Amino acid sequence: SKDAGEPFMSQGNGPVYDFYSFYLQIRGWGRLKNLTLGRYRLHEGMGLILNNDFSFGKLSTLSALGRNSNVIRAHSSRYAANYLQGAAATVTVVRGLDVTGFVSYRKIDATLKDGGIQTILTSGLHRTASEMAKKDVASAFLAGGNVSYRRGALHVGATGFYNSFSLPLTPNRKLLYKRFAPVGSAFWNASVDYSYVSPRLVVQGETATGSCGVVATVNAMSYVFSNRFS
């Protein structure tokens, strides 16, 4: 894809367009539920530690109640960020038990300072010499997996992954909005999630921790009292 103002077939934008998205996806082949090679997006659990599936905020949490919590989607969007690149697969081990594995390595745009990444850029814009100088200057690696068990109305799962950058993250924590931004080059996260779905009651949640050493949790509940009130 080409954004407005970006050079066409020149200044490092090429061979024709600035951004391409490619993938190969196989679904429903024996025990293999999903195999995606190339660029893809993931959503695990409630998305507390892993969600680049374009759903954020409180409303998305409520709208996702009762839905499949482990999703691999091919990245076919023109959006040149917020995706993984590599391979992801979900296999049914036995009835009700699925195992998902994923690995990703990709270049990222960033603002660098003193040998570190001060800001990760997600606009995907490469129009000027300044923006081109920030293109693909660092790389990100991610590998992990998910185990999910479903029986009747009950679902439980666990997710874990390791994430690293080629250069350390060095945000300016003096800025209020970056006060809690991560610092360093290697991180890990792990979580457990659950859901119970019945015709009237839906309960869903996820609790996580990581290399930051703190615990986070998100939980939601919906109850249908009548056709007009819930």
Predicted regions span which residues?
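Outer-membrane beta-barrel channel domains
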Residues: S1-S230
